[in-house]
């Protein structure tokens, strides 16, 4: 894996030199109309995911809009490193493009925890409307910029939902359930607020953990639940819709600033098209995943309005914790007209 990564990065660096030299005069520009090496885009996600669809569409659009003079190669499955390594390599300019879930970015950019405000939105369209709000997006671009990245946009995989063997009909049904979560203090605080027992665990251990009863439940987007067949070990999917599963597309600030204005515009336009396409694909895939789960006999439970209100009330300490660590202006811009929901 290390040798593979080294070859890819060496190729990228060699190509970057050639590409830069091709900007010197007309003769060399004509000779270097097409990059010798494609720019790498790294992702830790598997291939059959919305993350990969987002990345591939972006690369395709960059090539199309540039008339084939700008090329990007997508490397999924952590070929270029895990989430942390990808962020570090992107900041240093070694891997110019990264597509990933926002959760791992909180360590590098604490303000990204604004997306960990639980149980705020009722539909994914509401989330998208708020995420795309120009004022909020401008603030987030500043957050990423201060950390050494250029934020090109957010796609998503819908909401995160819970799978369990317990028929959840009231708040008390969450009590005592050992639920696997990511090692994120805000995510864990949410489940503790509901009375559950959050248990961080490596994702590769989740299926066998459910099978052996080490954990009672887990939470993920529908796509992850189906692609990893987690529903096979669970009787119910509970549509807690507690958090949107956002996917960011970022580029190294150092790399981006080295491009011409025309190239930057091509990248921004390609990112916008890819974002909309990925969202459409996500909606279609979620509908298909729900059908797969229902046909398996696993029951899907939707929470009523009363339960959503109770959950928001229980989550007040979580909101307060996030508000202490995230810019107040950023929280206000993200929540917008939904701020009253959590007060």
Where are these regions (language model features)?
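Short, flexible, basic/aromatic active-site loop/helix in glycosyltransferases
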Residues: 141
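Sec-dependent N-terminal signal peptides of Gram-positive bacterial secreted proteins and lipoproteins
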Residues: 3-26
């Amino acid at each position: 894996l290390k040798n593979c990564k080294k070859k890819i990065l060496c190729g990228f660096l060699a190509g970057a030199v050639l590409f830069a030299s091709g900007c010197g005069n007309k003769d060399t520009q004509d000779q270097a109309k097409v990059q010798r090496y494609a720019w790498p885009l790294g992702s830790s996600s598997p291939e059959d995911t919305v993350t990969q669809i987002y990345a591939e569409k972006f690369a395709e659009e960059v090539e199309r809009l540039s008339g084939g003079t700008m090329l990007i190669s997508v490397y999924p499955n952590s070929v270029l490193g895990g989430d942390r390594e990808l962020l570090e390599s992107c900041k240093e300019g070694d891997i110019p493009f990264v597509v990933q879930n926002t959760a791992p970015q909180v360590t590098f950019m604490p303000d990204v925890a604004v997306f960990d405000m639980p149980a705020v939105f009722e539909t994914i369209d509401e989330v998208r409307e708020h995420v795309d709000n120009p004022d909020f997006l401008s603030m987030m671009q500043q957050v990423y910029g201060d950390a050494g990245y250029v934020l090109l946009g957010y796609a998503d995989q819908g909401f995160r939902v819970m799978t369990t063997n317990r028929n959840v009909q009231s708040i008390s049904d969450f009590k005592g359930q050992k639920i696997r979560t990511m090692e994120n203090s805000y995510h864990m605080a949410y489940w503790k607020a509901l009375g559950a027992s959050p248990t961080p665990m490596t994702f590769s251990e989740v299926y066998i953990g459910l099978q052996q009863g080490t954990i009672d439940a887990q939470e993920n987007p529908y796509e992850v639940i189906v692609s990893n067949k987690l529903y096979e070990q669970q009787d119910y999917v509970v549509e807690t819709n507690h958090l949107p599963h956002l996917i960011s597309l970022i580029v190294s600030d150092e790399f981006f600033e080295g491009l011409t204005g025309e190239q930057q515009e091509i990248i921004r336009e390609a990112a916008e098209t890819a974002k909309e396409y990925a969202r459409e694909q996500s909606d279609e895939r979620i509908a298909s995943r729900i059908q797969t789960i229902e046909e398996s006999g696993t029951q899907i439970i939707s929470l009523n309005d009363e339960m959503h209100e109770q959950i928001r009330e229980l989550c007040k300490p979580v909101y307060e914790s996030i508000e202490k660590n995230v810019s107040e202006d950023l929280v206000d811009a993200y929540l917008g007209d939904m701020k009253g929901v959590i007060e």
